[in-house]
Amino acid sequence: MFAQILGETTCGIDGVQILVEVDVSNGLPSFDLVGLPAMAVRESKERVKAALRNSDYPFPMTRITVNLAPADLRKEGSGLDLPIAVGLMTCGRILDPEKLDNKVFIGELSLDGRIRKVSGVLSMIMDAKKCGAQEVYIPQANAAEGKLIHGIDVYTVATLKELVEHLKGKNTLTPLPKENILQNNNRIYHVDFADVKGQLVARRALEIAAAGGHSILMVGSPGCGKTMLARRLVTILPPMTEAEALEVTKIYSIVGLLPQADSVMLERPFRSPHHSISGSALLGGGSTPRPGEVTLAHNGVLFLDELPEFERATLEMLRQPLEDGEVSISRVRAAMTFPSKFILCAAQNPCPCGFLGDSVHRCSCKQSEIDSYKRKISGPLMDRIDMQINLSRVEFSELKTKEKGEASAAIRERVVKARLLQQERLEAVGIHCNAQMGRSEVVKYWNHNRLRFCNSTDKFVNSIQRISFYAD
């Protein structure tokens, strides 16, 4: 007997349809699994065998060959357990092969026949829809992701027996109801700009960075509020669109970081890796490339505190994602490109001791130490940071006041208005904010006659030279 069942796996952050071919023929009992399976897939043989027996379905004691096509793609994860089991039951005439057309099966099997949760289900459902499938069967624990994709029927199953009874028409399941992704987009943040005392210049700079999507570096002594301000940057960014929310949710589903309580990521990501992070953890890597912090921060904020403490080689890896909005990772087995459009928010002390220019403490560093500290950040990387501001210590009179600062919601309203103006202006060239403009867009849209502070050509040229405006 021969059967073909549709399954799904992941490659990078995208789903890939797999054709599971099962052949049961006469011969000594054996179970061969071919088609470049990873270790988790090879181990499915024992899980499938135990799940069938413990669900009261016979396991064929003959020669079994399972091929996972395309054979040149490495198959990762345990989500192919279910289609392999369905293929074996089809060969055993438990299921009718004609009723399995255009149906995709995703899930890991436990030894007692239950169907366990797998990572990356959202990407798999999206790929199944793109490939023309009509129905997808997923674990019950992945139901939240199944509600997000319209145009395809998604069923959840808890056990192998429940699936078989549905496919045989004995116990009909109903498809998951579809969910409007943005219906609950009223995010409640636990931090707010209203908590920040003083630092009016820094607050204004972060508002400009949020409005234009610009990267920013804050330099100041310890305790001046750099980290506090950075953690509130995400609260003034515009709400994510449906496409952005789905893209971020897909990434977090792949790496298994999707919050249990949420079906979709509505809050923009805020990632703050420690300065000891490796290059592969920051950009992504592994024998089969997986997303790193720059991809987990996609459509959000990547905060690098104590910037000079990071390894120089690690920081240099940020050049490509900051320039292109994506990161390419090449390995022997695969080459992947991951999205990485984020706002870089970095913070550092002005010197090794942290008190250069401080109004209270005296700096104890030698000039050579200060110069060496500043050289830890290369010129090419600094060129890619759009805004650099110096923060001073907040006066005690500002700290003791009970008056709250402007709330994040009020700042966010202005940011949203600014983004809408940019999107309207830049829609024709396919970009969304000022930070994404290239040389041609700057030449096309930048009208220097509107710069009122430049009342003469000489003053304008001197200003441009002073801020090191580059041709690229």
Indicate where each model-derived feature is located.
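Basic, amphipathic alpha-helical bundle interface domains used for macromolecular binding and assembly
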Residues: 40-45, 58-60, 67-77, 289, ...
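Walker A/P-loop
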Residues: 217-259, 324
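Hydrophobic anchor at the beta1->P-loop junction of P-loop NTPases
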Residues: 66, 218, 233, 304, ...
